Every structure is written in C-alpha cells, then in structure tokens.
Amino acid sequence: MRKQKLERVVVLSLMLAALQQNSVLAGDAISKEEYTGDKDKYYSYQDAVSIDKFVESQFSYKAASAVSAGSTGGNGFRIELSFDKNLTVDLDDPTAATDKDVYAVRAGNYATINIGGELLSITNNAIHSDPNDYTVNYGIYGSQTSKINITAQNTEINLGGNSQGKDETYNATGIYNAGIENYGGDFLAKNLKITGMMQGNFIGINNSGKFAADNIDIQAVSESGSMYGIKNTGTGGLDFKDVNIELELKSGYALTGIKSKSNLTADNINIKLQNGNTGLYVTDTASAPDLLVKGALNIDIVTNSESAVGAYAKGKLTVGKELNVFIDGSKSFNVNGIVSDIDDGITDAKDNVKMVLIGPRVFYTTYVVGFTGNTLLE
C-alpha cells in the first residue's frame, strides 16, 4: 500500500513538472532558444496565451522576441513549439525600448511553430532606443530552416511604433519567411490581415521560401522610405484566393503592390497605391514567370514617379473575367497599363476591360492581346 502511494506521488510530481514546463505566466515572453543537444524537443500550450513582453535572444546579438523557438545547431535536431488555442502578442509598452530588431513570433534554426485556435493576434509597436539604427519591427519571422504552420482561421498583424524621442527611422515587416525551398522556410496560413502606420520602410509579406495562404489583406501608410505589399523571391510560385493591397507613401515613390520572381496565381487581386509606381511586377532574370488572375484584377495608382505600370509579366499575363486599370500619371513621363514581354501574353477578360490612363505618354498595352468588345480606353 505504501509503495503504491509512493508511486502515485512520483507520477503526480512528474505530471506537475511537465505542466509547469509548458505553462506561461500572463504576459511573459516565451523563449525556447537553446542548444538542442542529441534529441528533438517539444513544447505545447493547450490554453489561450497572451503575451505583452519581449526578451533579448541569448544567441543573436540583434534580436528580441515575444515568442521564439530555435537552436544553435545540435546536429540538426529540432525544437517544436505549439499553441492549441488563440495566441495574442501585444507589444505596446512605451517604456520598453530596445536597440534590437523586435519579433512578435520568431522561428529560428531547426524550429517548428504551430499556432491553432480561431485567431492569432499580433501588435508590434515596439520602441527603438537608437533612432539612427535600421532596426525592424516584425510580426512573424521564419528562418531558412524553420517551419511555421498557422491553422488559426484568422491572423491579424498590426505594426507601428517609432524611435524613442523621434518620429523617424524605423522599419516594419509583417511576415518574413527567409527560407530556402527544399531545405526549410515553410510558411502556411489561412486568412492574413496586415496593417501598419510607420515612418520608414514597409513590407507586408517578404518571402524567399515556400509560402501558402488563402486570403490576404494588406493596408499600410508610411511617411517615407520604400513599401511593398508582397515581395516574393521564392521560386515555387504563389497561389492565393483573394488579395487586397492598399498602400500610401506620403514622401517618395518607391511603392510596389506585388513583386514576384515566380508564377503568381490568384482568384482576384485588388491593388490601390497612393504615390506608387508599380501595381504588379512578375519577372525573373532566369525565367519568364506568368501572372494569372482567374477572376478580377483591379489596379488604382496615383503616382508622381517618372514612370508607372499597372501590371507587368515577363511571361503570360492572363486575366479571366474583369480588368480595371486606373493610373493618374499626370506628373510622370511614361504610363503603362499592362505589359507582357512575350507576344502571346493575353487577357481573357475580353468584354470587361476598362483602362483609364492619365499622363503625357500613355501605353495601354504592350505585347498583350485580347482587348476586344466593350474595351474602354481613355
């Protein structure tokens, strides 16, 4: 009898130790950065988690994170960090300044992060102590050997903040997937909404690995610098459902809706740029990627740059049902509606094409055929 009681106490103690290992105090950062040694490690949080603090990385001199997982090697053994229910990260403490890049969620070397539930909510308004440094606020970051799986129905990322004592010199990126295909850097999500108000450079989604998502909504305003809605340097192509990008650059004109070096496919794309110069840009030095929009492609650009283009594809440019392009380039030298570098670039929109181009020199189409029926060119 005494032996059975002792065994129960031992089992209960082990269970409590495991629960403590995988629990988090309200607001505390979660850091699973370590040398993994000789085996994989797994951490799981079954309840909803809310975090409002970040900690500086013990392995990277330039990083501070609210949620982080990764190792320094360990012969390739992995760390896996899972959240079964809603995860909320809210970094908005004006007294917590840092000179590091700040990551709300960061998957480092050999790390897998799984996020479930209904909502992943991220606010990164971290304050930077060095106004002359090019530090960045990140929503989600994945390294070259990481995997990020977001099964939550919705992911919302809000970016802001500034340098301590100054309203300038900081940058923000919603999602940075820095992977190498067939090696790592896999990112999977459902519905993504990214918003931002900033003074410096902005990228909604920056991908060089394998990236998959359903619907994407990116809306941001910046005082100066450069802005991209989506910047894709991965070679595996992108395939989305509905994409909406609305960006405003108050000073300057280095503003692009989507730039991709591989095939881009979507059901519908809507791009609205204030002081932008390129709506869609699909090109690569080694190949001729295609742009395929199955439904409607809507582009609205007001620009003060020397030239502007609504949509450009080095390969085929295909629009399935409806094409609307409006470009106010009254301060520009050249205004281009849609452009394809090959003679059989085509739009299937046919009877549902409307282009309004304003500028001293306008080119509605270049090497793009299929404009018939009720096409309206003004």
Give the ranges of each region predicted by the language model.
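Surface-exposed loop/turn motifs in large extracellular/passenger domains
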Residues: 28-227, 231-277, 281-378
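Gram-negative bacterial Sec-dependent N-terminal signal peptides
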Residues: 1-26
